[in-house]
């Protein structure tokens, strides 16, 4: 049974790091899950992987959760195969994807999740759980082998979702860019996941944690604003065609 906790962001303004996600991770991870938690830190750009691991451990220490950076292992594929839980941190989705592909991590992580190993990611870490990275907000500062990512879910997430442009902004809005995506890929749902929101997926059940609505996009349909208490099960249905263009 797949077990996923997909988080929009690590912290909102005025919050400490993983303030909202920490309690959810505590509920999400069993005692057995905590034996060997691997953190994939490759989205970090302006700070070191060691600093990233330290920051995550400091935030999760009150919950008795300790992570081990994947970068510290000589054989990262073997480390993934031995993991009891996998966390993928935020940062730049393009760099994260390129590094995961180069190290041959996509299939081992996919296999681990299919075997029931819990997976949680925030921001870029939720992006790579999708079929592709096409709905990331990040600048493409690295070139991956392809846009294909883990495909742990059949829909796309846009984390840090904002439906309104900042005051004085004259460029494309997030809303317009996602409409472009679903126009080009009409069978793929996109969930605009506002900050402070998380998807919890266990098997064929999905729910939203957080107070904010989720905006749903689908080709040829009006966008929908759905309350966190809504039925999101349709997002887990496989699209009628195999994958996005």
Task: Describe the function of each predicted region.
Residues 6, 38, 85-89, 120, ...:
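Structural motif
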Residues 46, 93-94, 126-129, 198-200:
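Short, active-site-adjacent cap segments at secondary-structure transitions
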């Amino acid at each position: 049974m797949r077990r996923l906790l997909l988080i929009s962001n690590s912290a909102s303004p005025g919050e400490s790091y993983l303030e909202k996600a920490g309690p959810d991770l505590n509920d999400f991870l069993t005692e057995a899950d905590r034996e060997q938690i691997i953190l994939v830190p490759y989205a970090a750009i302006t700070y070191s992987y060691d600093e990233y691991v330290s920051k995550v451990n400091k935030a999760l220490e009150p919950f008795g959760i300790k992570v081990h950076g994947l970068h510290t292992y000589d054989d990262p594929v073997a480390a993934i195969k031995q993991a009891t839980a996998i966390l993928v941190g935020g940062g730049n989705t393009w760099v994260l994807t390129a590094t995961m592909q180069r190290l041959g991590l996509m299939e081992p992580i996919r296999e681990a999740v299919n075997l029931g190993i819990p997976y949680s990611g925030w921001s870029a870490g939720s992006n790579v759980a999708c079929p592709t990275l096409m709905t990331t907000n990040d600048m493409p500062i690295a070139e991956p082998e392809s846009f294909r990512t883990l495909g742990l879910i059949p829909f796309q997430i846009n984390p840090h979702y904002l439906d309104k442009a900042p005051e004085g902004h004259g460029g494309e809005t997030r809303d317009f860019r996602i409409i472009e995506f679903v126009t080009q890929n009409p069978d793929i749902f996109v969930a605009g996941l506002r900050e402070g929101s998380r998807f919890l997926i266990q098997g064929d059940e999905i729910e939203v944690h957080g107070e904010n609505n989720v905006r749903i996009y689908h080709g040829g349909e009006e966008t929908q604003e759905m309350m966190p208490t809504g039925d999101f099960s349709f997002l887990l249905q496989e699209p009628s065609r195999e994958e996005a263009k």
